[in-house]
Amino acid sequence: MLIALTGTPGTGKTSISNILSENSFEVIDINKVADDEDFIIGNDEKRNSKIVDVDTLNGYIKENYIKKDIVFIEGHLSHLLKSVDKVIVLRCHPDELRKRLSQKGWKKEKIKENMEAEILDIILCETVDKHPKKSVVEIDTTNMNISNLAALIIEIIKNKFEHMKKYNIGNIDWSEEILKDFYNKVE
């Protein structure tokens, strides 16, 4: 089973991937694969990001990992792969996301871009556009420590993504953050 582990940068993908690896799960860093296998087809200078040939990357993942038991495909593009069976979308409150990305030394404009993406559910919307809703869960990592998050993800896998109503898509909504800023400007 191929499981995409995705989310806006700063939601905890890399941290949880390290814990899952320590627990004997195979974790593939999609960004590393894209770099190593020359699936980068350009650069978006405005957004300071690489442009990845997702179709070719998908074919590579399908060809090399589809027959394995459980493989996590980690990265904020992993949900775009049609070859994955399940998707775990990690979410984080925008204020906490700002703190996490600031601690990583990110520039303000890039932090703002990612906060906006999180508020607008960009990754979740892209995920639902490519995968059946029953194959997708979303987890709020805002106040969750990494060990508890790892245990939760393992539980979700054991339950085969079923009976996890709390983690069904649509339970996390940061849209009030847009309104908060709007109302602060009015007052």
Positions of the model-derived regions?
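Hydrophobic anchor at the beta1->P-loop junction of P-loop NTPases
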Residues: L5
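ATP-binding Walker
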Residues: T11
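Walker A/P-loop
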Residues: T14
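A glycine- and Lys/Arg-enriched "phosphate-lid" helix/loop adjacent to the NTP-binding pocket
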Residues: G42, C92-N143, K158-F161
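Pre-Walker A (Motif I) flank of P-loop NTPase domains
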Residues: M1-L2
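P-loop (Walker A) phosphate-binding loop of NTP-binding proteins
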Residues: T8, L20
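NTP-dependent small-molecule kinase module
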Residues: V128-E187
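ATP-dependent small-molecule kinase phosphotransfer cores
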Residues: F25-L81, D173-W174, I178
